Amino acid sequence: MTRFFISPDQIKDRTVILRGGDRHHLLNVLRQGPGDEITVLNGKGEEYLVRITEVTTDQVYGEIIKKMERQAEPRVKLTLVQSLPKADKFEWILQKNTELGVSRFQPVLTERSNVKLDKSTQERKLERWHKIIREAAEQSGRQIVPVLEPVRSWSEMLAGCDTGLVLIPWEGEIVQSLKQVLERQPKIPELITVLIGPEGGFSLKEVVEAKEKGAVSLTLGPRILRTETAGLVAASALLYHFGDLGEN
């Protein structure tokens, strides 16, 4: 069934209103109209079955039939801090990790990042990245749209990275695996942050700075993973470990 994320202010009592791009997509792409049923989400985890009742020149109205009782969000909140790679790679990272269950994305510029963004370019990129995340969330059955933070420097990111379990996969770590780190956790962390380096990896200085802030370095295995693969592997392993992708 077709799914739409809308703002909570577009839900009034039992009436739902679709506007703009959602209206266009519903009518002109999906060819749906009065009598058809869709799924609407308010971005706060609430999901509704809605029947379309009326179409006007600028809005589509629907009636809430029932609130859906379904849990599609991981119990662990997972933040992916991704050193910015080239545009197409980052778009893939956003799409696939949204499908998987990541809750928040923090793009970051590191010493070996080969991406330069001025203010106007970043604004355009953020708009496109938001769109990719939203579409991936709709397609994959998410009940929230993951948060996308603005691009930050390494130092800015570390300053706000002081809660929960912080992990930094690093090719220089040969002793401690992700499994070993997780087995030492006394309880399920409410928040896990994973720091992923660029194509050339983190500098030693960055790893030291992260560990000084409490990050735990670890290895993801004997093979070196691409930047777009590393985050997906780490997120998959974490969500599986905590029971989101199957029984432990």
Indicate residue ranges for each PLM-predicted region.
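N-terminal positively charged helical leader segments and presequences
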Residues: 1-69, 120
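Active-site/ligand-binding-proximal alpha/beta "capping" segment
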Residues: 164-201, 205-206, 215-219
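Residue-level signal for inorganic ion chemistry
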Residues: 35, 97, 133, 210, ...
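A generic structural signal for short beta-strands and their flanking turns/coil linkers
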Residues: 2, 12-14, 34-36, 46-48, ...
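Glycine/charged-rich beta-loop-alpha catalytic/anionic-binding loops adjacent to active sites
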Residues: 16-18, 75-79, 190-193, 212-220
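RNA substrate-binding interface of SAM-dependent RNA methyltransferases
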Residues: 65, 71-167
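Structured adenosyl-cofactor binding patch, chiefly the S-adenosyl-L-methionine
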Residues: 204-248
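Short, glycine- and charge-enriched coil/turn segments that flank and shape catalytic ligand pockets
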Residues: 9-15, 55-59, 69-72, 119-120, ...
